[in-house]
Swiss-Prot record:
This enzyme's EC code(s): 3.4.21.92
GO biological-process terms attached to the record: protein quality control for misfolded or incompletely synthesized proteins
Protein name: ATP-dependent Clp protease proteolytic subunit 2
PANTHER family associated with the record: ATP-DEPENDENT CLP PROTEASE PROTEOLYTIC SUBUNIT, ATP-DEPENDENT CLP PROTEASE PROTEOLYTIC SUBUNIT-LIKE-RELATED
MF terms in GO: ATP-dependent peptidase activity; ATPase binding; serine-type endopeptidase activity
Amino acid sequence: MGSYTIPNVVERTPQGERSYDVFSRLLSERIIFLGTEIDDGVANVVIAQLLHLESANPEHEIAIYINSPGGSFTSLMAIYDTMTFVQAPISTFCVGQAASTAAVLLAGGDPGRRFVLEHARVLLGQPASGGRQGTVSDLSLQAKEMIRIRSQVEEVLSRHTRHDIATLRADMDRDKVFTAQEAVAYGLADEVLSRRLAVV
């Protein structure tokens, strides 16, 4: 999370005052905030939160707010698979940016529950290679793995955006940046929000 201080929220209850860090307070409202690069540690925390919230109430919506530059493909897929595994409906919100692997999480929300805030951006690009080194046979294996990873990302995005693989491959050949409106038109999200949805 960097070196900045995580704010606390103080609540008054009949038993007295109780202090939470803001992320725990959001979790009590069934909100998960993903605001960092995605690595194994971040993925494990998000997965634990998803499983906890499903266990508490498998029918009540879980909201994931995303402001992330992306990150590890395996970490992304661990979160994505858990999102599809749990019974609870999943809504996704892009605030700031959902770049690279984070864009897949945005698109992976339940149909009709994928939102992007008005001035956010979404970026599609090829999964990072990580600057691999090694013998020729090692590099050959790594190249095959990168092709497999790219194919998996394309298949997931095709499922959620309704674009064919060839279109996605061409669009992801270089980084492609979408405004909020363009992300909706492309099928990465369902609606642009400028204000919170009314509670009914």
